[in-house]
Amino acid sequence: MSGMDTKEKRIRRKMPESLLLVGIVLFFSLLALFLQGIPALAAIPEEWKRGISTILLPVLLLVILYGMVTGKISERRMVFLIVCLTMLFHCSYCVLSGLYERQHDLGVYTGIGDEQVNPGHLGYIEFIYKFRKLPKINPYELFSYYHPPLHYLISGLWVIFLTGCGMAEELAFENLQVLTLLYSGLFLIVCLKILKQLGASGKGLYSALLLCALHPSLMFLSGSVNNDMLCTLLIACCIWACLAWIRKKTLPRLLALALAIGLGMLSKVNTAVIAFPVGLTFLLDFAGVLFESRQTGKQAVWKELRNYLLFGLVSGVVGLAWIVRNLVLFSELPGVPTPANDSVMSVRAYSLWARLGIPALADWNFSFPFHGISSEYCHNNWVIMFRTSLFAEEFPAGIPAVPLILCQAAYILAILFGTAAAVLFLALQLKKALAARKETAGGQKGALLRSPLFQESCFLGTGYLAFLLGFAVFTIKYPYTCSSDFRYIVVCLLYTGIGMAESSRLLKGRISARAAGVIRAGVCAATVLASVSVWVIVIWRWW
């Protein structure tokens, strides 16, 4: 055993974990680029690619499950295997799914040979590629142009680079998926950093990573060409940076948080939701500093104010640049163009309770758990959220009995254990807040407000609730079935994973620890079953 430990330490000295994991992500991203961008490799029969993936994925998964159950694989190797599984899963999906499959508001591109300006995410990217500049038109005149430009600027430059290297235009646009594949891998690494920061290890860590590794929603986003995956990555960076600042309140960490929020808003405006829990954390800390200043003097107060001013300057200049630009040039406030009121997606005819209340049993429609765009088929926000989280907007009419049973089982397990995991997460944050209160009892006034444990629990708990509440408000403001898509709050998977990871560390009672273990096992089972179901209905489609 000591020999293995020594070997492990040597490997760790030779290759830091973060560098190794980033290398894995880059390897699979380049693999997807070559398989889609080099004509000879792109011509390999799809059956071969599908077959190889279908052999390797279960093997990797079984090794990981063996390590989770027996504990005979070291943590470093387990993390390595989970990242490999994630990237193989996402890379296979990108390679086996075309540019026009399962996209949202994709639009079209007509190529550099004409002067046509096209709508949709592809049109936005093509504009930058074709005209070598950002659009100077009113962003609400063409669909999808209202989005902030960061993702589209990166994508446009990527197409320019690939075509400049000699790649055919069609293949270059197909390889837009490589960027979102890269983002999905980096998202998992940031999730790992957050979980390690919170003290996660062992089965709790593995179950949380497995949720983010195999959850179908992240697989779908890894092959998308819109801005959702980059936005999700940057929100995760905000969470990571804020937790780092809570532990050590330095100006560089505060500015890193400001930059993450600013870039997130420059990717998608709904990143602003993270500002609410961040603002609460700042408020708690500043109130604690004010209490302390009665004994230590006002110097700390002025230092805090200076730091917050710099934070606001960096995050505001970067994050609000697009909003201010549209307001000055076109007198346009942020918003989303909506379909017509008589659209089949409109849910205006239904009451708020029918849309946002607890769904009736009939609303769940367990017999066919897929999302139909018509509000007559389904109009409850939470039902649509669960369906799109597993199967996106797939509607496989004529699906045979066996795949359908797999999907039904995954759907039921996801509802039961997903809800239980959400409750577990919130309960753990409350437990941490009460523990912080107990630790600081009898201390100086304001000690609780500056307690890292208390700030952490408030930041995470209110952050999760802010995303759920923001999601509900969004569906009220834009009352269409498409507004209830889980992709808008896919970062909630990270919060769920945090709850799963922390449960193995914080719950020591016999009953509570067993209950948490059942929830972790149930979430992992639902995730694995959902990924298998999606692979069957999306990739194989033998019927």
PLM regions: where:
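Membrane-lumen/periplasm interface segments of specific transmembrane helices
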Residues: 304-418
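Perimembrane helix-loop-helix junctions
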Residues: 241-247, 274-316, 340
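Start-transfer (signal-anchor) and selected internal transmembrane alpha helices
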Residues: 1-96, 286-287, 300-314, 442-458, ...
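Transmembrane-helix signature of polytopic, membrane-embedded enzymes
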Residues: 167-171, 191-214, 232
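Extracytosolic helix-loop segments that constitute the early lumenal/periplasmic catalytic or substrate-binding loops
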Residues: 91, 95-143, 150, 160-162, ...
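Membrane-interface anchor segments at the N-terminal boundary of transmembrane helices
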Residues: 40-56, 170-184, 370-465, 493
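Transmembrane-helix motifs of polytopic, lipid-linked glycan transferases
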Residues: 65-67, 174-199, 237
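Membrane-interface transmembrane helices that cradle and orient dolichyl/undecaprenyl
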Residues: 196-199, 238-253, 264, 286-289
